[in-house]
Amino acid sequence: MTFNKVAASRSALATVLALAAFAVPAIAGDCTGYVVGVRPVSQYNHATGAGFLAVRSGPGSNYAQHGELYLGDEISVWDRNGSWYYVYCMSGRCTQPYWGQPTPQGWVYGKYLSIGGVCP
C-alpha cells in the first residue's frame, strides 16, 4: 500500500470509530405515546368499562386488570406482544387514578395508543 492509501484507510477508520461512539442502541423507553380513542373521564364508569383503558397483568383481555389509563395520558412503551403493549404511565390522570394504583404499568390493547419513536 502506498502512503496515501494507508493514510486514507486510517482516516476512514477514525471516522467510523468516531461515529460509532455516538451511536446509541435503542433501548426500552425510547417509544412514547398517548392514550387515544377512549371516552373522556367525564364519562368514567368502572363497572361498564367507560372512560378508561384497562391495564392488565398480561397481553390479553383474559388477564386481570390492575390499573387504568385515561384519554390523553402519556405513556412509555417497553414491550409488545401482537396488538398488546407493555406500558408505563408517565403523566396525566393515571398519576391519580379513579381506580387502582397511581402510575400503573402493564399490558394495554394497542388500538387505544398513539405511539412514536423507536418502538418494539
Where is each model-derived feature located?
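Residue-level recognition of short, solvent-exposed, well-ordered loop/turn junctions
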Residues: A64, Y70-D73
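Bacterial N-terminal signal peptides that target proteins for export
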Residues: T2-L13
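SH3-family beta-barrel domains
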Residues: P25-S57, L69-L71, W78-N81, Y112-P120
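Short aromatic-glycine-enriched beta-strand elements
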Residues: G82-Y86
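Bacterial N-terminal signal peptides
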Residues: A12-A21
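N-terminal post-signal-peptidase region of extra-cytosolic proteins
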Residues: S57-Q65
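N-terminal cationic leader/targeting segments used for protein routing and processing
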Residues: K5-V6, H46, Y63
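Boundary regions of SH3-family modules and the immediately adjacent low-complexity/disordered segments
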Residues: G29-R39, A64, Y88-P120
